[in-house]
Amino acid sequence: LEVWEDEGLCHQCQKTLPWQLEVGKQVNFCARCFSPLWYRGSVRRGMEQFKFRGGQIHARLFGTLMAQCLHDQWGEEVDCITWVPVTRRRLGERGFDQCELLAREVGKNLGVEVVSALEKVRDTKQQARITSSSARQANVTGAYTAREGIDLTGKQVVLVDDVVTSGATMAECAACLRIAGAEKVIGQTVARA
């Protein structure tokens, strides 16, 4: 996935992307979860560059695609955007939280406030390395919590993650947001596996 800082993607690359045209994935505690792309080929490679090699220019591209997808698919007003956080250890290793960067790009594109509403309170195994849905759910159960003092009462909150597979991480975080008062949680990812 060749991304140019000043132009984004060339038109030829845009045509070859694995566009995800379904209406959205059903995820527990979310109204829907939207993703503009399928997680394969050039998208998978681009996400790996973004997450593991510091290709932060991808955040702008992916964030723009996510914002357009949310605008086109959801169509209702949202009150704020938040993200699935990484642990402090992972933040220290990478130097950035990829989902926070994505959330900030989506917020900038849509003119919506971005808030840090969640924290990851324990390390988990990488979800991508776990194959069964039940094991994925067990891996993230209790790993997230709403930040102390956060009040989302009556709000429609967009929850940003990079990729949705089984929906276990998204559901766990969405449940925390609902406990913090969110009326609706709308999932938004770059890609769906």
What are these regions (language model features)?
Residues 1-193:
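Glycine-rich phosphate/pyrophosphate-handling loop used in enzymes and phosphotransfer proteins
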